[in-house]
Amino acid sequence: MFEGRDELAITQEDIKRALGKPSVEWAMLIYLRRCVLCHACTAGCVAEQKSPPGIVYRPVYEEEMGVYPNVKRRFTPRPCLQCDDPPCVEACPHKGEGKATWKSKQGISAGVVMINYQECIGCGRCVIACPYKARNLDAGDFYTEETPKVQEYETAPSWEYSRKWVRQKSHIPYGTARKCHFCYHRLKNGMVPMCVSTCIARANYFGDLKDKDSLISKVMQANKVKVLQGVRGKGEVKVKYEALKGKSPKEISKMVGYPGHNPVFADSSKTKPRVYYILP
């Protein structure tokens, strides 16, 4: 399957080939047996996106299962799953292509749930609606704000959604919903998502599922893959919408909390995720 070549090099070739096609279907596959909880993907993502406190697009959770003495641990990366039927988009009062958020189905961004920071009103409904807790609101914090001067690396430009953003107090993307976007700005330039390129164990596969010759397609065909189930029901979401009124971005993010222990994997999910898993 790999022909003695590095998987990362093959993935980059797959991405460049996909960019020459009229439409793509981006997806990610995570091989849980390979994950060693090094957090290289998380650190790489934070550095790439200039992420502030409270915003982590690529968390990796250490999850314990079973009852002593039959206890097992699993390391589970949990980015935005880029659902084909995303509850976060459905919950947005300003949804639609080019508006606050939408599921892209065409062009280079096909397969990615997009956010337009300039249109997002920061209401928090999408944050609460996501059953995977993959979204958070930018509360405007800085790691070095209590020092004499906010350090330059925290206000350095980022290129999310292929636009230049300089993060400052009370300026976009402050107050907006934020999440993983498969490093769309890197994809447009034929580059591999940062979490994929920084993984020391090569636990991630990424590419175009429409391309049956792509590495991700071949690995998925050769293995039994699963998707992650959500952790909340619609009833709880509706109740929490009312509780959002008057809340600050930081308060809303605290309402989201931890995505839950003992994640449930299944053959399919109602949200139709674009991130797949090979279980240990």
Residue positions per predicted region:
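Non-ligating segments of multi-cofactor redox enzymes
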Residues: M1-P280
